[in-house]
Amino acid sequence: MTSNALKVFISDLHGELDVFDFLADRQFGILHLLIRQQFSPELNETLCAAIEASAIRLCRAANASQAQLDRTSAVSKEILFTALFLMVVQQKAEDESLTIAIRRWGWLSTVHRALSGDAQLSCTPFSQLVEMLAQNIRTLSAQDFFALVQAFAKALFKKLSPELNIVGDIYDRGQDAFAIMERLRGLPNVAIQWGNHDVVWMGAASGNLACITVAVRICLRYGTLDMLHRDYGINLSRLERFAAKAYGDDDCAQFTPKGDLNAEEKLRIARMHKAISIIQFKLEGKLIARRPEYTMADRLLLDKINIANSTVTVGDAVHPLLDSNFPTLDVEQPYRLSEDERKVAEDLKQQFLASAKLTQHMDILFHRGGMQKKTGDWLLYHACVPVDEQGEFQPFALAPETTRGQSLFNFCELEMRRGYLNRMVINDRNESDIAWFLWCGPHSPLFGKARMTTFERYFVADKQTHKEGKNEYYNLRSNPEFLARVATELKCSSDQVRIVNGHVPVKYQSGERPVQANGKLFSIDGGFSMPYRSATGLAGFVLLEALGQIVLYRVIPNDKRYALEVEYQQILKPKAASVPAA
């Protein structure tokens, strides 16, 4: 990926395609910014919006059509044509077809030369140049007009193609993570900083059984089975047969899936959901046992169940169970899979490893992604750099040597890559376990909490047991001095560095704001995911460094439509040119 003067940052897409497409149509806000920068206050907001809408509708090379153009009013054609041409000239956009067009039509060449500073023409009033464009457009045939608009659009969009940085969590509960990954395949300049939901799928594609069951469980919980079956070719028929057999007399009420389903479908999926959840807890127990360095013994809860009393001990407290039907639980060996459960897990593993489309998408995450990235004066990572209660970088005994800060990021990324590269190799190193640790491990840099309380949320009513406890990083990141220490630890020496995080939704309606520490930190999880919008009041954020500015837009939801509103704007001072040494 090459560095680009136009930089875009978004995060926490969570499989929500509609917001992603809304932003992509607008070059992730750059087109919106450019139009208003170049034509306000000369044109009012209504005309600016009309130009933007016309440009989006007619000028994307893949979508523009002669039929669409023919339905556009003459006035709109003049506005669109003139605005596009002026933007092309002012942005110095170049394209072979545009150059040919300018040579062919002399009046285009005249306006182009005048706007570009030709000494003989530069004194021509701007209004006269605009009128010249408007008059001559009326003489063009529909075919020539269409060809010119496409030439302008291609040149402009090529010029405005940004460096797109996704600060984690393409995957999760939304149904369209597959479609988003397909969109990203076609974009030339994309970087991804892994989120904890992403590494679950990366671990699953590496053959890690715990990650596989987590990925399947989330799809069952949120009703995104089409992505598993239709898109990635993962067949759940063996799981379904097992669930019907083991839980056929169980209403599995605690596992009712989200979404608009009929009663029969809900029950069928609820049984599968419970079946895979129990398999997940057993496999996680095995992983915790072989990885004592993860310090996750508090997540071993199956052995704390008292079936006779229908209770479970969490910490020092005994709680009644919301569901006490465990037909496959062996109280003597609670983490042992039954033979049927083992076959389900192995079947899923073979399918995840064999899915060509999943491998293709995970290749993108590995090849274009990583734990962190520095681009220009920006430092990007999904969640946090873990620190202890004193604000010191938290040590982890994950490797032969204790890791923290930068060495922790380096170790985790290397292990992730090893696990994926060795996914077909049979050995006892279990390198892909790191993906599961990054997903839910205590104070993992992609999770940033003390524990993930999945079991408690299914089986215990007391909400005190559901609390997960954020890392101290989140209490300190509003302090510029702390952020400077973080930047130094992650090898960013510039005093101009700005940090971008996602992961934690900004509760905008409650008064939280995305810009912290005097503009040194941008927290940009704004609610792409529909369930979070009740808390954020938004449909996401998009952060730009473009056209000499830093701009943070709020994405405002309105039924199925969206709008951009400025949250933060800063004009950048031009950097002084470096002087070569004598």
From Swiss-Prot:
Q: Does the keyword section mention Cell membrane?
A: no
**Keyword Phosphoprotein belongs to the record:** no
Catalytic reaction equation(s): beta-D-fructose 1,6-bisphosphate + H2O = beta-D-fructose 6-phosphate + phosphate
Keywords tagged on the record: Carbohydrate metabolism, Hydrolase, Manganese
Question: Domain of life of the organism in this record?
Answer: Bacteria
What GO annotations for molecular function exist for this entry?
fructose 1,6-bisphosphate 1-phosphatase activity
Co-factor(s): Mn(2+)
Q: Which cysteines are joined by disulfide bonds?
A: none
* Protein's pathway: Carbohydrate biosynthesis; gluconeogenesis
The processes (GO biological process) annotated in the record are: gluconeogenesis
**EC number(s) per entry:** 3.1.3.11
Question: Mind telling me which Gene3D superfamilies this protein's record contains?
Answer: 3.60.21.10
Family per similarity comment: Belongs to the FBPase class 3 family.
Protein name per the record? Fructose-1,6-bisphosphatase class 3
Question: What organism does the record attribute this protein to?
Answer: Saccharophagus degradans (strain 2-40 / ATCC 43961 / DSM 17024)
